[in-house]
Swiss-Prot record:
The record marks 363 as: Required for activity. Coiled coil: none annotated. HAMAP family: ATP_synth_alpha_bact (MF_01346). This is ATP synthase subunit alpha. Its main location: membrane. F-type ATPases have 2 components, CF(1) - the catalytic core - and CF(0) - the membrane proton channel. CF(1) has five subunits: alpha(3), beta(3), gamma(1), delta(1), epsilon(1). CF(0) has four main subunits: a(1), b(1), b'(1) and c(9-12). It is found in: Cellular thylakoid membrane. The keyword Chloroplast does not apply. ATP binds at residues 170-177. It is an enzyme of class 7 (translocase).
Length: 505
């Protein structure tokens, strides 16, 4: 019989006690009371934060938005078809984040950073909060560098600067997305990171845009964030903030970035849907009371940072869709008041063949003139006024039978200026070409050319400058100024091209 050795037993027990670690995991859990329409009402979750991510039993994630006395209202980020009444919900202790890093460039991602392009996982370097505070007053500096769009009408009359918020507004099918995509294409070789956020669009439309960017080599410096029309309203609501977080990552590294939110009307509608389902009180047009804050906190994140913070910038081009040209509706007026100007696209101008269909009279850039290059500022000063006067005269001339010579000349000049500013899609002009085109129109050098030949004159002038006067392009592109030597070269080129056009007529 084995003898019991108490000292050995006590040493073993002591050893076990020393090795014991009290690993108690405290979880904040609740129970689903009700689920449906992308909303879950949860009982419990006493310690949950506003905007915190919660996890359901089936793996679906949600965001706690309504914190009430007896329940929590959460919006789902997935279908949530397997969530049942009485199932358990866990609070994660995290606020919505997106993985960011240089590897995002050239990729198509969801608002939560999941790859959508079938190219495998993205090697992110850090996580950023989807919602983060905008830079303060001291962190910013005024807008002073140009953000060239490649569209002559915009760069000459409604210039955009790096760090500006410029609204693109108009009815459906007036070319809003076309302007945004042209601006991305024009950033090639400019060391600008572009972020295109597609909100509530058809998957086929987004696929077409990605294909255009890929064909023209623009995907090499672009990130696409897509929340299609088939996605839950929560993801459509989060998509712009995710795009801003990605752009902020590059901005904080001292880079220039361009973000396009296409379009914020869909985001506001998604937010309205969520708010009404959460039983928040509706306001004007059934939007919740904080719909202004929805867009202001997003667009205020666009900035030109001070040199102490690296001098990076985020330029925002939000898109808003109007109904029958009504810019006095709730969402358009909100976003107009937040942004630094707007480019208004008119369906009447679009249908009359003027593309881009920019209504110069009510389009404005409030801070961009400080960033406009000297070359184009020097010659485009009177362009906007002349076109506005032409529109007024053209309306008046419909009723007047006999017009004096000066009025006839002004109408003829206006028609030619309007023709000059027509530009096909996906063909941005470099600065030197824009200077040449605007110079020819403003100085009256094409007044003898028939109106139907103006487009031919523009394309011939562009090719002539490239082949016969490359020194003009080189001078203007490098100095960003139109000096006397460059002006002399330009006059020669215009005279030569004009002679050829008139000879062929």
């Amino acid at each position: 019989m084995v003898s019991i050795r108490p000292d050995e037993i006590s040493s073993i027990i002591r050893q076990q006690i020393e090795q014991y670690s009290q690993d108690v995991k405290v979880e904040n859990v609740g129970t689903v009371l009700q689920v449906g329409d992308g909303i879950a009402r949860i009982y419990g979750l006493q310690q949950v934060m506003s905007g915190e991510l919660v996890e359901f039993e089936d793996g679906t994630t949600g965001i706690a938005l309504n914190l009430e006395e007896d329940n929590v209202g959460a919006v789902l980020m997935g279908e949530g078809r397997n969530i049942q009444e009485g199932s358990t919900v866990k609070a994660t202790g995290k606020i919505a984040q997106i993985p960011v890093g240089d590897a995002l460039v050239g990729r198509v991602v969801s608002p939560l950073g999941a790859p959508l392009d079938g190219k495998g996982e993205i090697a992110a370097t850090e996580n950023r909060l989807i919602e983060s505070p905008a830079p303060g007053i001291i962190a910013r500096r005024s807008v002073h560098e140009p953000m060239q769009t490649g569209i002559t009408a915009i760069d000459a009359m409604i210039p955009i600067g790096r760090g500006q918020r410029e609204l693109i507004i108009g009815d459906r099918q007036t070319g809003k997305t076309a302007i945004a995509i042209d601006t991305i294409l024009n950033q090639k070789g400019e060391d600008v990171i572009c972020v295109y956020v597609a909100i509530g669009q058809k998957a086929s439309s987004v696929a077409n845009i990605i294909e255009v960017l890929r064909e023209r080599g623009a995907l090499d410096y672009t990130v696409v964030v897509a929340a299609n029309a088939s996605e839950p309203a929560t993801l459509q609501y989060l998509a712009p903030y995710a795009g801003a977080a990605i752009a902020e990552y590059f901005m904080c590294k001292g880079k220039a970035t361009l973000v396009i939110y296409d379009d914020l009307t869909k985001q506001a509608q998604a937010y309205r849907q969520m708010s009404l389902l959460l039983r928040r009180p509706p306001g004007r047009e059934a939007y919740p009371g904080d719909v202004f804050y929805l867009h202001s906190r997003l667009l205020e994140r666009a900035a030109k940072l001070s040199d102490a913070l690296g001098g990076g910038s985020m330029t925002a081009l939000p898109v808003i869709e109007t109904q029958a040209g009504d810019v006095s509706a709730y969402i358009p007026t909100n976003v107009i008041s937040i942004t630094d100007g707007q480019i208004f696209l008119s369906s009447d101008l679009f249908n009359s063949g003027l593309r881009p269909a920019i209504n110069v009279g009510i389009s404005v850039s409030r801070v961009g003139s400080a960033a406009q290059t000297k070359a184009i500022k020097k010659i485009a000063g009177t362009l906007k006024l002349e076109l506005a006067q032409f529109d007024e005269l053209a309306a008046f001339a419909q009723f007047a039978s006999d017009l004096d010579k000066a009025t006839q000349n002004q109408l003829a000049r206006g028609q030619r200026l309007r023709e000059l500013l027509k530009q096909p899609q996906f063909s941005p002009l470099i600065l030197a070409e824009q200077v040449a085109v605007v110079y020819a129109g403003v100085k009256g050098l094409i007044d003898e050319i028939p109106v139907n030949q103006v487009t031919a004159f523009v394309s011939e002038l562009r090719s002539y400058l490239k082949t016969s006067k490359p020194e003009f392009i080189e001078k203007v592109q490098s100095s960003k100024q139109l000096d006397d030597a460059a002006e002399a070269l330009l006059k020669e080129a215009i005279a030569e091209v004009k002679k050829n056009i008139l000879a062929a007529v």
